[in-house]
Design a protein with these regions (language model features):
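Acidic, low-complexity terminal tails and accessory targeting/binding regions
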Residues: 1-3, 16, 21, 104-130, ...
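Phosphate-coordination/substrate-recognition cap region in phosphate-metabolizing enzymes
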Residues: 43-136, 206
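An N-terminal RHG(E/S)-centered segment typical of histidine phosphatases
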Residues: 1-70, 85, 89-93, 220-241
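Beta-strand elements within well-structured catalytic alpha/beta cores of enzymes
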Residues: 2-6, 73, 177-183, 191
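GST-like fold's C-terminal all-alpha helical module
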Residues: 157-173, 177-185
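Active-site signature of alpha/beta-hydrolase-fold catalytic machinery across serine-
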Residues: 86, 190-194
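Phosphate-handling substructures
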Residues: 12, 16, 25-29, 33, ...
Length: 241
């Protein structure tokens, strides 16, 4: 299995945080949309997945005719669905939503006076069916919002990362599948540490730019991290963190 972890395109929250002003929590959306720049980024990403080289400048396969993605998953957060939908459409694939791929914390609002984080329902099945009719949804998604639980503490994301890795291995391990997952920067740190068998980085970060790609190859009894945070295909004018 070749695994391609892709961070979503720029969201409105990402754009606000670049400004680093005192009103960020007030303007923050629990489930932000993509910005106009983010919409440009997804077009660049989709075309690169279709016709770019998956090798990251390495001389490995000599493949310059696209990534050959066979399966594509995304979280149920709107910014990830929008990103994944553009890629899936360009590749002629069915996009499958996977709730566990969500960002650390889940869907929540911040109470400015106390900085308390309160979990929210999130969009329900009808919302996704209307807005993203070709998205394959989990059977468990109903008329209630897909989140509908308290704020997820960072420590609670660790077993979720393990669960994602185990499911990917069960579904695609030992095959030639090329799997793309469209997810989030905070969760990527958790997920990569899980793959490496490394302690979680309590006071550290692993950068992934918007629409950056990280590739991990899984073999019969070993794996290799081919690259992390690949951004060479993103034009400077649309590059964002």
């Amino acid at each position: 299995m070749q695994l391609y972890f892709i961070r979503h395109a720029q969201s409105t929250n990402n754009a606000y945080w670049i400004q680093q002003d005192a009103d960020n929590d007030l303007r923050r959306s629990p489930d932000p949309e993509l910005t106009d720049l983010g919409c440009q980024q997804i077009g660049v990403l989709a075309k690169f997945l279709r016709s770019g080289s998956p090798d990251g400048g390495q001389i490995t396969s000599g493949n310059n005719g696209g990534f050959g993605i066979t399966h594509i998953y995304c979280s149920l957060m709107v910014r990830a669905v929008e990103t994944g939908a553009a890629a899936a459409a360009e590749l002629g694939l069915l996009l499958t939503a996977w709730a566990d791929l969500h960002e650390v914390g889940g869907i929540y609002e911040v109470i400015p006076e106390t900085e308390e984080r309160i979990g929210l329902p999130g969009p329900n099945r009808a919302y996704f069916e209307e807005r993203f009719p070709s998205l394959r949804l989990p059977e468990s998604l109903n008329d209630k919002g897909w989140w509908s639980r308290p704020f997820e503490k960072p420590d609670d994301a660790v077993p979720r990362a393990e669960r994602i890795l185990n499911v990917l291995q069960d579904r695609h391990g030992g095959t030639d599948d090329r799997v793309a997952v469209v997810s989030h920067g905070g969760f990527f740190k958790m997920f990569l540490c899980q793959i490496l068998g490394a302690p979680q980085l309590r006071n550290g970060w692993i950068s992934m730019a918007n629409t950056a790609i990280s590739r991990i190859n899984f073999h019969a009894d070993w794996f290799d991290v081919a690259y992390v945070n690949r951004t060479d295909f993103i034009p400077p004018q649309v590059y964002t963190l």
